[in-house]
Structure formats: C-alpha cells, structure tokens
C-alpha cells in the first residue's frame, strides 16, 4: 500500500498527466497513508470547505476545496465506484481523458458492488482499482468483514478486467506503467484490478529482466540450479509469496528438495 501511495504521489506531480490523475477513496485514506494528499491536492467539494476540521493545525489536515483533486466519498463504496466509472469513461463521454485510481478495502469491491464492476466492463471504463489491505493477513482488529482472499476469483469473471496480485513495490510499478500504456496509449477498453497489502516487510531490488514476466503474470524469484536430487516448483503471489520463500528454505534444509520459486501475479 505504501508503495502505491508513493507511485500515485509521483504521478500527480508529473507535468504531462498529473492533472488528469483522479485519486478516489471512500473513508480509508489514513489507513492507506494518503492523508498527505489532503493538503497537497485538496479534497474536491463543489462548495469548498464550509467548516474548520478538528485536525486543522495538523500537517496533513483535512482540506476541501473547489479545485481539489482527491475524491473522498466517505463510507459510500457504491458512490466512490460510480465516481471512478464516471472518470474512467470521460474519454468517450466528454472527449477528455482522466486516469482514475480508486483504492478501498478489497473486501468492499467486487463482493459489495460487483454489479458496478460488470457495468464498468460494459461501459469500457479505463482506470485502476486498488484492493487495499488484501490477503487475509492484516486488519484482524476490524473483524473478518475485511479479510479478503477471493476478490480475484470474482474479478476473473469480467473479461476486460485485468487483475494482478503483486507482493513487491517494483512489481506494482511495472504493472501500473503497463496499465497506463495499455489503456491510455494503446487505448484498449480494459481496466486493471490490483490487490495491495499493508504488511511491513523487506522490499528487494527487481531481478534483471523481470519486467516481461511480471506483465505476463509469472516470473522466477529464485532458483537453486546447482543442486541435485528431487526438485519442485513453488508458485505464490501477494501475501503468500513470503510463505513460499520460507517453505523453500525448509524444503532445502530439512528435506533436501530444491526449487525455483515463481511469483504469480
């Protein structure tokens, strides 16, 4: 999630496309670490800010303005998704291309407003959906209603929804770059769904030449080519990649089975 926010912050500062980026969030902006955008970009309000927020003295205060760029919809996933669809179809409805990024708790996307996801496909919406806190590994304190591990099964039923489940920040950067090219340069009528999680773990450098495999959906993270004997392949994505890497150590040290670990997207 942190890697996504950094990528988004870079995109909104780009002189060519920054003004076309539409960050959309229901009520979870602080969970995702997006509160810095409140002051930087402002939250869109047709009437401006008519009150003084409680955090007015804070560095990342809640700031609404008529020219704000962030759409903060509150606890209204259907409304936020509808705003994403409106921005994602502006290229055809208004002949003005916008690039919407809608991030939300991933359990409250396809499972809650799946009909809108289908409608987005029918309308040839272009944009990015980010299922935050995915993987069933964090946010237990807020209950099982946030524990998403199956939204990709639902996303796979929509033909023009391209979904990825990355584990590392460099994968996310490659996927978003490819999505921008796919939708806004090649002008394909698709949208991207990407799950991101909020666990804190080491972010390695990208293996040389991994970009093509990341885009296609699978690439090799590590391989014990020099070993002999029984060999297996471990395939994993998202939050489970680190578990697969840990399993590889156990297999090699205790059972003497070597494996090339492959990262699924």
Annotate each PLM feature.
Residues 1-204, 211-213:
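Thiamine diphosphate
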Residues 30, 241, 264:
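Glycine-rich nucleotide phosphate-binding loop and flanking beta-alpha elements
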Residues 82, 177, 242-246, 259:
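A broad detector of short, well-ordered amphipathic alpha-helices
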Residues 204-207, 245:
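Short, well-ordered secondary-structure micro-motifs
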Residues 213-254:
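Long hydrophobic segments that form regular secondary structure
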Residues 255-265:
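Single conserved hydrophobic/aromatic residue that forms the stacking wall/gate
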């Amino acid at each position: 999630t942190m890697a996504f926010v950094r990528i988004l912050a870079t995109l909104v500062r780009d002189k060519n496309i920054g003004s076309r980026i539409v960050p959309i969030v229901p009520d979870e902006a602080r969970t995702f670490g997006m509160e810095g955008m409140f002051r930087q970009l402002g939250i869109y309000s047709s009437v401006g800010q008519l009150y003084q927020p409680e955090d007015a003295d804070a560095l990342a205060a809640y700031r609404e303005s008529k020219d704000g760029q962030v759409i903060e919809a509150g606890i209204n996933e259907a409304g936020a998704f509808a705003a994403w669809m409106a921005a994602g179809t502006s290229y055809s409805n208004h002949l003005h291309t916008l690039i919407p990024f809608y991030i939300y708790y991933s359990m409250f996307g396809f499972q809650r407003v799946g009909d809108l996801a289908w409608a987005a496909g029918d309308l040839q919406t272009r944009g990015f959906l980010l299922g935050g806190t995915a993987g069933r590994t964090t946010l237990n304190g807020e209950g099982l209603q946030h524990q998403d591990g199956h939204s990709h099964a639902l996303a796979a039923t929509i033909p023009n929804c391209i979904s990825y489940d990355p584990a590392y920040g460099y994968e996310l950067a490659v996927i978003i770059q490819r999505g921008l090219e796919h939708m806004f340069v090649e002008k394909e009528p698709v949208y991207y769904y990407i799950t991101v999680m909020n666990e804190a773990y080491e972010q390695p450098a990208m293996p040389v030449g991994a970009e093509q495999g990341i885009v296609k959906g699978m690439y090799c993270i590590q391989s014990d080519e020099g070993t002999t004997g029984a060999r297996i392949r471990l395939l994993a994505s998202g939050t489970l990649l680190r578990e697969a890497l840990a399993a590889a150590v156990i297999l090699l040290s205790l059972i003497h089975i070597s494996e090339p670990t492959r990262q699924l997207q």
